[in-house]
């Protein structure tokens, strides 16, 4: 095989032929020429850049009116033959066949006149009248590269059988010199190499972002246009990528074909299984250059980096709130629509996020696969284990820029920030009351519905919040696991300990704008404000008396019911209120009440 020139891998058109091509076909020509040139360079064949390539890279018209021919480089000789021992001929064929046949095979220009090279392809009976002119010309390039002439058909068969064989044997003879990753075909290695070279040929006119592939640019443009051409027939939801629609459909079918060999858990996406496997290995390959923190997912690292930059590019058109991630914006939008598309098959409860449904489903199974290595405590969600681990480390990585206060969780920091802004985006449709947290709105709604789904197994008392049930349970055990380091006093709940600590510091960060009075708890400030507004939203259904606090209404109701939940352990006497029980106990202790 003799020395090659760039002309050997270029396609030539006459002026008449060039004028027959439409814009799409001319762009196709440009892509093929650039692709062929890059493949030759990547294969290690040194060549000075032809005028044609320079012209195409600059986006200029390839036809020269003076010369009346396509600007093909002068016969620059490649510095060497294709070295058969370094680059097996068969795989070189694979590379160019992928470019010329597979990727550019459907141009549909029926009456394009052909030059000699294409006629020779007809002699080989490669295209029995079914292919169009431009495709034939592209295939002619391949003929020139491999010097097949009349045996191109045989070369195709051999190439395809070899490629088929590689799939079954899983041989990966082509190795990336940059990162060591191996591939079965040289075309795949060529595509992969762009990751290292960062060669971006397709630029977005809207934002300037560049991409290696025109198809990737096309997908990216949909971010700006908002186009969502792929629609789910089941629920009508639309997507900007077909792959996202395929993933979404599995929600309706419940299909989970990907199984973890370690624990047997199944997933509806292969990527989710891959992510899950890292739980078993403990591997954290993605490290933050800013603070050194490591993560098991690249997406988590990307999200984490925004802590350092403060970037929030995704804005809600409804209320103006900005988010670091597009997924968070999507989740947030459901607040405005009230939509709950994710339904539990066991109990029928609906959720606005698939993650919330997954969290809920564990209630029915009772499964707790995530165990803490420090104390052995098990959790039903990996996120809960992560949250729990901070108890052992004491780490508080999330700091408020406004006041310097640090928090263990980003969600707690987000909630805290609202103290400074005073924002209350969550409004009750029933009574128009607004809240700074969606969870508080959910809790509040139960006042109107009267729903109390959380029941104590000991005494049968029901609560509208799970946290209230947890607190109540401790009244049966008298357990006080949270101890003050300053005075040694024990508390049943960490929140009570936090409130107690302020006694020692004297801090009162919550100030009334009306009268200037300061409080050590936000709840006390909220209660105090009602003095100025005169608001009494809690009304007794029995007698119509109104109260400014729900706790006062609860106490008042006991007058009508006769309920006496506070019992003296010493003499079994019962009382309506805990304060009266406290006073009563002094009779038994002999302690003198301080007035």
Swiss-Prot record:
Similarity comment: Belongs to the krueppel C2H2-type zinc-finger protein family.
Coarse class of the protein's main subcellular location: nucleus
Species assigned in the record: Homo sapiens (Human)
Name of this chain's protein: Zinc finger protein 85
PROSITE patterns: KRAB, ZINC_FINGER_C2H2_1, ZINC_FINGER_C2H2_2
Molecular-function annotations in GO: DNA-binding transcription factor activity, RNA polymerase II-specific; DNA-binding transcription repressor activity, RNA polymerase II-specific; RNA polymerase II cis-regulatory region sequence-specific DNA binding; zinc ion binding
Superkingdom per UniProt: Eukaryota
Tissue specificity: Widely expressed, including in testis.
Pfam family, one: zf-C2H2
Source taxonomy: Eukaryota, Metazoa, Chordata, Craniata, Vertebrata
Chain intervals annotated as zinc finger (C2H2-type): 146-168, 174-196, 202-224, 230-252, 258-280, 286-308, 314-336, 342-364, 370-392, 398-420, 426-448, 454-476, 482-504, 510-532, 538-560, 566-588
InterPro entries: C2H2-ZF_domain, KRAB, KRAB_dom_sf, Znf_C2H2_sf, Znf_C2H2_type
């Amino acid at each position: 095989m003799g020395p090659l020139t760039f002309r050997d891998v270029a396609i030539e058109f006459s002026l008449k032929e060039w004028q027959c091509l439409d814009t799409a076909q001319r762009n196709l020509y440009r892509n093929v020429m650039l692709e062929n040139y890059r493949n030759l360079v990547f294969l290690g064949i040194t060549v000075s850049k032809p005028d044609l390539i320079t012209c195409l890279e600059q986006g200029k018209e390839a036809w020269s009116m003076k010369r009346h021919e396509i600007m093909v480089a002068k016969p620059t000789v490649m510095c060497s033959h294709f070295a058969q021992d370094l680059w097996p001929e068969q795989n070189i064929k694979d590379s160019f066949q992928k470019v010329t046949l597979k990727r550019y095979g459907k141009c549909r220009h029926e009456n394009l006149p052909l030059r000699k090279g294409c006629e020779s392809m007809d002699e080989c009976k490669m295209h029995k009248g079914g292919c169009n002119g431009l495709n034939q010309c592209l295939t002619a390039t391949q003929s020139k590269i491999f010097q097949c002439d009349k045996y191109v058909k045989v070369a195709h068969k051999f190439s395809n059988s070899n490629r088929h064989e590689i799939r079954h044997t899983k041989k990966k003879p082509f190795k990336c010199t940059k990162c060591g990753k191996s591939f079965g075909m040289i075309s795949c290695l060529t595509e992969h190499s762009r990751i290292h070279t960062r060669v971006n040929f397709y630029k977005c006119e809207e934002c300037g972002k560049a991409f290696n592939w025109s198809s990737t640019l096309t997908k990216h443009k949909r971010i700006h246009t908002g186009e969502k051409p792929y629609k789910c027939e089941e629920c009508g939801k639309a997507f900007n990528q077909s792959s996202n629609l395929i993933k979404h459909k599995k929600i309706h079918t419940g299909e989970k074909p990907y199984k973890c060999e370690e624990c047997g858990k199944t997933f509806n996406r292969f990527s989710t299984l891959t992510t899950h496997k890292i739980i078993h290995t403990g591997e954290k390959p993605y490290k933050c250059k800013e603070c050194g923190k490591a993560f098991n997912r690249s997406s988590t690292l990307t999200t984490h980096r925004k802590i350092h930059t403060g970037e929030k590019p995704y804005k809600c058109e409804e209320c103006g709130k900005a988010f670091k991630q597009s997924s968070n914006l999507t989740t947030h939008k459901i607040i405005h629509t009230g939509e709950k598309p994710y339904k539990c098959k066991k109990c029928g409860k609906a959720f606005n996020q698939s993650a919330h449904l997954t969290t809920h489903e564990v209630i029915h199974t009772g499964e707790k696969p995530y165990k803490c290595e420090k104390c052995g405590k098990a959790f039903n969600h990996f996120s809960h284990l992560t949250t729990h681990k901070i108890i052992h480390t004491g780490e508080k990585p999330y700091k408020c820029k406004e006041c310097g206060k640090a928090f263990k969780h980003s969600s707690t920091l987000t909630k805290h920030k609202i103290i400074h802004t005073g924002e209350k985006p969550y409004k009750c449709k029933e009574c128009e009351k607004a809240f700074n947290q969606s969870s508080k709105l959910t809790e509040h709604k139960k006042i109107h519905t009267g729903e109390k789904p959380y029941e104590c197994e000991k005494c049968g008392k029901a609560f509208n919040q799970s946290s209230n049930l947890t607190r109540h349970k401790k009244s049966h055990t008298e357990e006080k696991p949270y101890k003050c380091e300053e005075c040694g006093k024990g508390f049943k709940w960490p929140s009570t300990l936090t409130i107690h600590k302020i006694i020692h510091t004297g801090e009162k960060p919550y100030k009334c704008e009306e009268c200037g009075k300061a409080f050590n708890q936000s709840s006390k400030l909220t209660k105090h404000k009602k003095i100025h507004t005169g608001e009494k939203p809690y009304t007794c259904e029995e007698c119509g008396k109104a109260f400014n606090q729900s706790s006062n209404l609860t106490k008042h109701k006991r007058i009508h019911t006769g309920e006496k939940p506070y019992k003296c352990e010493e003499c079994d006497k019962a009382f309506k209120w805990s304060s009266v029980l406290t006073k009563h106990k002094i009779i038994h202790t002999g302690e003198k009440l301080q007035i």
